[in-house]
């Protein structure tokens, strides 16, 4: 008889958290056993959690051996401590929260290896975003002049998006060292956007948007634009489902959905 896999959802009150709760509720062999939120009321059914699910307001309340998986859609301020806690308690994290530094991610990878606990941090769970990054990395071999525009909803806490930063890192790995317009002068501070190893990143925050990204390449007499659009948060759930099904095959923390596909 197959054992039911137990899932804790951190940030279950948010839009992505609710999508994750709905996903797990409809997955065979998985069950939401708990939620973590500092502001939730102790009424799990109000948040579409099973009636038996426990709601915790902080990490210190969570008992040992509660869950097998930890889905995290919280905030940039909370995510590092959340994932650290999960790894220390041998709960496999599936993390969609962005905003951690490279140093924090590196520390968590070291911890996961020490504890021999697999997990995933994904800047984006959408398949279109994963493919955009893959295609952009390939194009960078031939078009070193490139800029990134990412557009998200007005409530997004971090900028640039984790997807845009991950895209820039992948491009930088595959691109000759290059600085576009090295002699430019800004007459309005930061008008040219953020800079990652010579790659300009522009962040747009507006109502009505969900998650969108364009990578613009320019060359002599030609241009290439790669774009992806997420029109509904439900589009990310296929990636979360894949992660839940695969992370128990890992013995360390992995960055990027593309690395488990």
From Swiss-Prot:
Keyword field: Amino-acid biosynthesis, Cytoplasm, Diaminopimelate biosynthesis, Lysine biosynthesis, NAD, NADP, Oxidoreductase
Pfam families: DapB_C, DapB_N
Cross-referenced SUPFAM superfamilies: Glyceraldehyde-3-phosphate dehydrogenase-like, C-terminal domain (SSF55347), NAD(P)-binding Rossmann-fold domains (SSF51735)
Domain of life according to the entry: Bacteria
Enzyme class label: oxidoreductase
A GO CC annotation given for this chain: cytosol
Known pathway: Amino-acid biosynthesis; L-lysine biosynthesis via DAP pathway; (S)-tetrahydrodipicolinate from L-aspartate: step 4/4
Subcellular localization, as worded in the UniProt entry: Cytoplasm
Positions of NAD(+) binding: 11-16, 96-98, 122-125
Keyword Amino-acid biosynthesis among UniProt keywords: yes
The protein's Enzyme Commission number: 1.17.1.8
Biological role: Catalyzes the conversion of 4-hydroxy-tetrahydrodipicolinate (HTPA) to tetrahydrodipicolinate.
Name of the protein described by the UniProt record: 4-hydroxy-tetrahydrodipicolinate reductase
Species of origin: Lactobacillus helveticus (strain DPC 4571)
């Amino acid at each position: 008889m197959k054992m039911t896999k137990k899932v804790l959802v951190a940030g279950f009150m948010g839009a992505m958290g609710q999508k994750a709760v709905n996903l797990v509720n409809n997955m065979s062999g998985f069950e939401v056993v708990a939620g973590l939120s500092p502001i939730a009321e102790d009424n799990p059914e109000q948040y579409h959690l099973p009636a038996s699910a426990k709601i915790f307001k902080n990490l210190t309340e969570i008992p040992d051996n509660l869950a097998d998986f930890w889905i995290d859609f919280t905030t940039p301020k909370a995510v590092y401590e959340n994932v650290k806690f999960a790894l220390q308690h041998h709960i496999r994290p599936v993390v969609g929260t962005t905003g951690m530094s490279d140093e924090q991610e590196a520390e968590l990878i070291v911890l996961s290896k020490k504890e021999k606990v697999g997990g995933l941090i994904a800047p984006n769970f959408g398949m279109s975003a994963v493919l955009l990054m893959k295609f952009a990395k390939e194009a960078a071999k031939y078009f070193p002049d490139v800029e990134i525009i990412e557009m998200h909803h007005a409530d997004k806490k971090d900028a640039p998006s984790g997807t845009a930063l991950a895209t820039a890192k992948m491009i930088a790995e595959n691109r000759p060292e290059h600085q576009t317009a090295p002699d430019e002068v800004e007459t309005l501070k930061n008008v040219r956007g953020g800079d990652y190893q010579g790659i300009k990143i522009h962040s747009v925050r507006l109502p009505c948007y969900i998650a969108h990204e364009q990578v613009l390449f320019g060359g002599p007499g030609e241009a290439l634009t790669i774009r992806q659009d997420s029109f509904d948060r439900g589009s990310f759930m296929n990636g979360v489902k894949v992660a839940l099904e695969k992370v128990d095959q890992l013995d360390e923390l992995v960055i990027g959905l593309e690395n488990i596909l």
